[in-house]
């Protein structure tokens, strides 16, 4: 093993409470839906690609509107997460410090562009990671982005740590 590639949600932090509130605010402001998103709902959806999440949450809307709404949810989510860092998992920085001594660290997640950067900025953990990718950056799903990280950084024996 020469490197570790982490997912973000459910692995490094739990942003679901903050995101749920931001998404619910968008839904109530911009739709006629009486839908309230909670952390449990998001835990069941995170890990999927955003268009898939949009089709679940906004099934009654045309595809174009689904994508617009999920984009708005993500914009509000970024603002909320920049204002308040989501809870990090216990001893995360200490663990990353220890891992960084022997392994190269990366992040790959099925999220929108900017989300990983928000995590790195608000958590202050950016110095531990050499690189990161997501579908919002590449248009590719997690598996393809993991392969891209492996190729770009010439990793020989990486492991992936995540819940999906």
Could you tell me what each predicted segment is?
Residues 2-93:
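N-terminal helical cap/lid subdomain that shapes the substrate entry/recognition surface
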Residues 3, 142-164:
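Conserved Lys-Pro-Asp/Glu-containing loop-to-beta segment of HAD-superfamily phosphomonoesterases
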Residues 11, 109-111:
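Conserved phosphate-coupling serine/threonine residues in phosphotransfer and NTP-handling enzymes
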Residues 23, 54, 92, 116-120, ...:
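Hydrophobic packing residues within well-ordered alpha-helices of enzyme cores
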Residues 41-42, 125-140:
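A short, structured active-site edge motif that brings together acidic residues
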Residues 79-107, 117, 143-144:
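Short, acidic loop-to-helix structural element flanking the phosphoryl-transfer center
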Residues 104-106, 131, 159-161:
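A structural signal for isolated positions on well-ordered beta-strands in alpha/beta enzyme cores
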């Amino acid at each position: 093993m020469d490197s570790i590639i982490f997912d973000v949600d459910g692995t490094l932090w739990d942003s679901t409470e903050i995101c749920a509130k931001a998404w619910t605010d968008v839904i109530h402001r911009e739709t006629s839906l009486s839908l309230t998103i909670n952390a449990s709902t998001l835990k069941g959806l995170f890990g999927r690609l955003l268009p898939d999440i949009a089709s679940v949450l906004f099934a009654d809307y045309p595809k174009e509107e689904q994508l617009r709404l999920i984009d708005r949810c993500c914009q509000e989510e970024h603002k909320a997460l920049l204002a308040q860092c989501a809870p990090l998992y216990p001893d995360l920085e200490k663990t990353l410090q220890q891992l960084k001594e022997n392994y190269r660290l990366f992040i790959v997640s099925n999220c929108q562009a900017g989300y990983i950067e928000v995590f790195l900025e608000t958590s202050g953990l950016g110095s531990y990671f050499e690189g990161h990718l997501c579908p919002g950056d590449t248009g590719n799903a997690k598996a393809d982005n993991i392969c891209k990280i492996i190729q770009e950084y010439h990793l020989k024996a990486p492991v992936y740590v995540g819940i999906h």
